[in-house]
């Protein structure tokens, strides 16, 4: 199951970088000029386009691949280097990797923003699933 998910995520990353510069420039120009007619179908296509074109989403996928420990694997301790260019191991819970390529294992302290990939330090909880504050 985990291998299937990994292959799907890697396909998403590969396909998101497959667009040529010309296609990207055309999409940017279209968005700036506002030459669209909107409908429910447009909203869905915009969402799908965003998943494949937006480099922020590609970075999010890479962070997900590098930031979490695998079952029964040794993990990277708090404050130690992490990321897919540094180690094949994820950070120990509740830490996450501060950058997907080369970062440090950190956690979110009390009163700071937390969410989907930014976990609160031990003993704290996030009051939101995607955007919240550590309490």
UniProtKB/Swiss-Prot annotation:
Which processes are annotated in GO (biological process)?
defense response
Q: List the disulfide bonds.
A: 75-92, 82-97, 91-105, 107-121, 114-126, 120-134
Which key words are in the record?
Disulfide bond, Ion channel impairing toxin, Knottin, Neurotoxin, Plant defense, Secreted, Signal, Toxin, Voltage-gated sodium channel impairing toxin
Role of this protein: Plant defense neurotoxin that causes pain and systemic symptoms in mammals via modulation of voltage-gated sodium channels (Nav). Potent modulator of human Nav1.5/SCN5A (EC(50)=55 nM), Nav1.6/SCN8A (EC(50)=0.86 nM), and Nav1.7/SCN9A (EC(50)=208 nM), where it shifts the activation threshold to more negative potentials and delays fast inactivation. Also shifts the voltage-dependence of steady-state fast inactivation of Nav1.6/SCN8A, but not that of Nav1.5/SCN5A or Nav1.7/SCN9A. On Nav1.7/SCN9A, principally acts by binding to extracellular loops of domain IV (Nav site 3).
**Tissue expression remark:** Expressed in trichomes, that are stiff epidermal hairs located on the surface of petioles and leaves.
Q: Give the organism's phylogenetic lineage.
A: Eukaryota, Viridiplantae, Streptophyta, Embryophyta, Tracheophyta
Q: State the domain notes.
A: The presence of 'disulfide through disulfide knots' structurally defines this protein as a knottin. This toxin contains 2 'disulfide through disulfide knots'.
Molecular function via GO: sodium channel regulator activity; toxin activity
Any GO CC annotation of this UniProt entry: extracellular region
UniProt-annotated location(s): Secreted
Signal peptide extent: 1-18
| Predominant place of localization | secreted
Q: Which organism is it from?
A: Urtica incisa
Positions annotated as propeptide = 19-72
- The protein here is known as Beta/delta-urticatoxin-Ui2a
In the record, the note on similarity to other proteins reads: Belongs to the urticatoxin-2 family.
Q: Does the keyword Signal apply?
A: yes
């Amino acid at each position: 199951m985990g291998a299937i998910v990994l292959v799907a995520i890697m396909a998403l990353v590969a396909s998101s970088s497959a667009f040529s510069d010309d296609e990207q420039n055309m999409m940017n120009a279209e968005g700036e000029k506002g030459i669209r007619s909107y409908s429910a179908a447009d909203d869905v296509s915009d969402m799908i386009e965003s998943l494949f074109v937006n480099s922020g989403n590609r970075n999010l996928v890479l962070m997900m691949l590098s930031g979490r420990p695998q079952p029964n694997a040794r993990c990277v301790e708090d404050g130690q280097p992490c990321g897919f260019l540094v180690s094949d191991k994820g950070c120990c819970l509740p830490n996450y990797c501060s950058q997907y390529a080369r970062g440090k294992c950190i956690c979110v302290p009390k009163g700071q923003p937390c969410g989907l990939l930014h976990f609160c330090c031990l003993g704290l909880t996030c009051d939101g699933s995607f955007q919240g504050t550590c309490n």
